[in-house]
């Protein structure tokens, strides 16, 4: 297992390096002069001031040298300096990352638990009203745009009913500490986490249902029924364990989509995470922040995929541990 994990880590390093190079070249291929943006308005500053800015941020060097310096800094977690916020990018991301991990983590667990549970329930009631009802809701959640769900959730539960706060990480100026602070954050987390998780709940539900029905038709399940095992035992020990394999694979692949969905969710709910930081950086053309968020997001996705591979091996020991 250790050799397997080390092999995956080596591959992840090379993949991350390729992502760094691609994102760097993509950002620098965009039209516009970063130095002019730093000056406040394009063309508003004289050439000497723009030249000083280019020299300060290394923009006067050849592209290959800028790329080398960026990769060298990224290895040391030195992601550059934000000219807009006047602070290191690594510090900015470090301040925002816990909020994003909390949001995406809760949304991921919520969607996985609800999706698998609903999928199992639907497969057990195939062709009946329960299956139809669950499948209809899953299709509805899957087809509805995320931003519309976020806006409607805010309008209904925050504006009309006033049950839940519609924006922010915690109550401004409340000064809560200890358990009171935890409960306050949890209350603010309900709407964004539920909104982000609904789409993925529908995906996991549909995948679990289809996988459960497929596995239930295999020979070993028929053998288990012939031995007189109860329906619950067959569902839990034989069908569900094998049906979860494609769900686990899908969950690992969609880690990046959850981070992508966090950008929109955090923007609508004013959640202070790296998704909102990315949105602000794009509007301000703060290139170092954009590259820094790309870097951290790619690293997190690769980490999730590694965890998925390990879980896959644990769930199905028949899989060979090859690097």
What do these predicted ranges mean?
Residues 16-68, 161-182:
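Hydrophobic alpha-helical transmembrane segments of membrane transport/permease proteins
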Residues 59-116:
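An internal, D/E-rich "acidic patch" concept
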Residues 2-3, 16, 97-130, 146, ...:
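Alpha-helical transmembrane segments of integral membrane proteins
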Residues 6-12:
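N-terminal signal-anchor/signal peptide hydrophobic helix marking the start
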């Amino acid at each position: 297992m250790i050799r397997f994990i080390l092999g995956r880590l080596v591959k992840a390093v090379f993949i991350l390096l390729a992502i760094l190079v691609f994102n760097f070249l993509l950002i620098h291929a965009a039209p516009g002069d970063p130095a002019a943006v730093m000056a406040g308005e394009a063309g508003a500053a004289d050439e000497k001031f723009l030249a000083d800015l280019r020299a300060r941020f290394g923009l006067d060097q050849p592209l290959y040298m800028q790329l080398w310096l960026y990769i060298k800094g990224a290895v040391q977690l030195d992601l550059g300096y934000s000219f807009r916020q006047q602070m290191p990018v690594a510090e900015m991301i470090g301040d925002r990352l816990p909020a994003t991990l909390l949001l995406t983590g809760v949304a991921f667990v919520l969607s996985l638990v609800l999706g698998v549970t609903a999928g199992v329930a639907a497969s057990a009631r195939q062709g009946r009203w329960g299956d139809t009802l669950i499948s209809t809701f899953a299709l509805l959640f899957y087809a509805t745009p995320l931003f519309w769900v976020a806006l409607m959730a805010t309008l209904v539960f925050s504006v009309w009913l006033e049950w839940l706060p519609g924006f922010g990480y915690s109550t401004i100026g409340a000064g809560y500490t200890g358990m009171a602070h935890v409960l306050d954050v949890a209350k603010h987390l309900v709407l964004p986490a539920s909104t982000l998780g609904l789409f993925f709940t529908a995906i996991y539900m549909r995948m679990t249902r289809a996988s459960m029905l497929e596995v239930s038709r295999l020979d070993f399940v028929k053998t288990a029924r012939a031995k007189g095992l109860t329906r619950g035992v067959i569902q839990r020990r034989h069908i569900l364990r094998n049906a979860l394999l494609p769900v686990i694979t899908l969950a690992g692949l969609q880690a990046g989509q959850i981070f992508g969905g966090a950008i929109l969710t955090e923007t609508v709910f004013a959640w202070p995470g790296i998704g909102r930081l990315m949105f602000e950086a794009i509007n301000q053309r703060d290139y170092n922040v954009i590259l820094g968020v790309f870097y951290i997001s790619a690293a997190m996705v690769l980490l999730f995929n590694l965890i998925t591979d390990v879980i896959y091996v644990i769930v199905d020991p028949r899989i060979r541990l090859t690097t």
